[in-house]
Structure formats: C-alpha cells, structure tokens
C-alpha cells in the first residue's frame, strides 16, 4: 500500500526502507540487495540509497514508498492519494513512473484519487463514487493509461476524447455535490 504521506521509517535509510519487507520475510541478503538495488534504479534513487528519508523531497519519499511496496512483490497495489501532496511537475513525473511500473510488472493497481485528470490518465477503469451512502455511481473504460505508457502525458491530455470525458465526469460530480448540499436548481 502506498499512502498520501509516505509512511516511511524516518530513522532508516532509503535502502533500509525499501529492504524492510524482504528482511521481514527472512530473504537471503544477496537476494534482498538485488531487489533493493533494482527498485532503486527503477525509481531513480540509487544515488540516495544511504540518505535518511527525512532528507528527501516529498516526491523522492513517494518514490521510496513505491519501491518499498514493490519490494514485497504484491499481486495488488493499493495507492491511496499517493500523489496529492506533490507539486505539479513532480506529480506528472510520478504519474509516468506509475504507468511505466504498471506496464512492466503487470500488477493490478487500485488508485484512489480526487483528481479527475489523474484518474483519467492512470486508469483503465474509472469508478465514480457517490456519497451517502458510498456506492458506485458510474464506471468508465478508458484508453488513456495505455496511451500514456508510450507517450508524454501532456500529449495524452490532447487526445480528442480526454477533454470531453473530463468535463462529463466533473459535471457529474458537481451535480452530485449540489444534490447533497441542497443547492441544485430544478430545471423548469
């Protein structure tokens, strides 16, 4: 699981954080080192492996959290608002990294986000939830994640279906919010 706040062990180095799961499984040291080194290469943090995580930027900490999750080799990765606190450029780079890892590993990734644009870019399926009670309001099948694996995400946003789909979902959410707040105007 990858959280909005990295949930890293502050007293450990980057390498120790990524290797924590394999250590708990009593993995042989050579195997653990190979996995940790590979994942640090994948997330671009090899040169920071001996740094304490509190010395890293937010984006770097999220990459450590992602590598730590992958070191456990889960079948399913749950990401709960993992990019929400990042600046726009770092967020876009992390979105590209998530797509790359999704394609390379074949892992199922469940991403929880409040960003419609992020959901469109990273999801093959997008589920819009309705509140009170929480339930599925609408589900979409999307082509954008597959396109984003091999293209700059800024180009994917220019796809002719992207903007209209984004507006449709935002309008749907806006309407649900107005219903909840009791501010929706009835069409006469």
Language-model region placement:
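Conserved signature/switch motifs of ABC ATPase nucleotide-binding domains
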Residues: 51-54, 72
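Short helical segment in ABC ATPase nucleotide-binding domains corresponding to the A-loop/adjacent helical element
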Residues: 3, 15-23, 33, 37, ...
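Catalytic "switch" loops of ABC-type ATPases
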Residues: 4-9, 115
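Hydrophobic anchor residue at the start of the ABC signature
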Residues: 66
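Conserved ABC ATPase "signature" region
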Residues: 19, 30-48, 100
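Conserved H-loop
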Residues: 106-112
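Catalytic Walker B motif of ABC-type/P-loop ATPase nucleotide-binding domains
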Residues: 77-80
